[in-house]
Amino acid sequence: MKVAVMELRLYVPWVHSLKEKRMVVKSLLGKIRNRYAVSAAETEEQDIHQTIVIGVAAIVAHAA
């Protein structure tokens, strides 16, 4: 069994409010989850509107 964990730190200078950030984060999370079949969530910096931190995790039962 293999476990993969990744943290993505993104700077989004065009976002000027938490509402705008929420729209960007929801879109990114949906695309990541649908395309790669992994677990993903916003993990840090939730109150800072120009920084997005996304944690991604996957578990594989056997090596591909």
How would you describe each model-predicted region?
Residues 1-14, 23, 28-64:
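N-terminal intrinsically disordered, cationic/polar leader segments
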Residues 20:
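A contiguous binding-surface segment within folded domains or other stable secondary-structure elements
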